[in-house]
C-alpha cells in the first residue's frame, strides 16, 4: 500500500499494488492488480486479475475483466469491460441520460474481450463494443460496434484560412 490510501470494505487479491492517493470502497480487486496512483473505485466495482487501473481513473459499478488496462484519466461507470481490453487516456462512459423519471436514469456500456479504445473517446450508453473491435481516437460512439470492426465517429477537420486573424481582431 502506498501513502494516503483509503480503503473501506474491500476485498483485495494477493500481490496487488495500491498506489498513493487511491480511494476505494465496497469493491473487489483481483490478484496482481495495479491501482493508482489516485484511482477511485466507487461501490460495486470489480477488477479482474492482472489488470491495471491507473492514475485518475474512476470506476463506478464497473466490472473489469482480466489483463485489461485503463491506464489514466478515465471515467468508467455502469459498465462491463471484458478481458484483454486496452482503454486509452481520456475515455468516458456517458451513462446518465439527463432525465429524472422515478430517480436517475443510468445506462450500461458493454465492452467485450480484445477491444482497443483509443484516447479521448466517449461511449454514449446504452452501447456495446463487440469482441475485437477497434475504436479510433477522438470518437464519440452512439451505436453498437460490430465484432472486429473499426469505428470512427468524429467530424472531419476543416481549416479556414485567415479566420483566426479575423476572430482575434473582433475582440
Show the residue positions of the predicted features.
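Glycine-rich hexapeptide-repeat left-handed beta-helix
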Residues: 17-171
Amino acid at each position: 500500500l502506498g501513502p494516503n490510501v483509503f480503503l473501506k470494505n474491500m476485498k483485495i487479491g494477493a500481490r496487488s499494488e495500491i498506489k498513493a492517493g487511491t480511494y476505494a470502497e465496497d469493491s473487489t480487486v483481483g490478484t496482481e492488480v495495479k491501482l493508482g496512483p489516485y484511482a477511485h473505485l466507487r461501490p460495486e466495482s470489480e477488477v479482474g486479475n492482472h489488470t491495471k487501473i491507473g492514475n485518475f481513473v474512476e470506476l463506478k459499478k464497473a466490472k473489469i475483466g482480466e489483463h485489461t488496462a485503463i491506464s489514466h484519466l478515465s471515467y468508467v461507470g455502469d459498465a462491463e469491460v471484458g478481458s484483454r481490453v486496452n482503454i486509452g487516456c481520456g475515455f468516458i462512459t456517458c451513462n446518465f441520460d439527463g432525465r429524472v423519471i422515478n430517480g436517475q436514469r443510468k445506462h450500461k456500456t458493454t465492452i467485450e474481450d480484445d477491444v482497443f479504445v483509443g484516447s479521448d473517446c466517449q461511449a454514449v450508453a446504452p452501447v456495446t463494443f463487440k469482441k475485437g473491435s477497434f475504436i479510433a481516437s477522438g470518437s464519440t460512439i452512439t451505436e453498437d460496434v460490430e465484432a472486429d470492426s473499426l469505428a470512427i465517429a468524429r467530424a472531419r477537420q476543416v481549416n479556414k484560412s485567415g479566420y483566426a486573424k479575423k476572430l482575434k481582431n473582433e475582440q
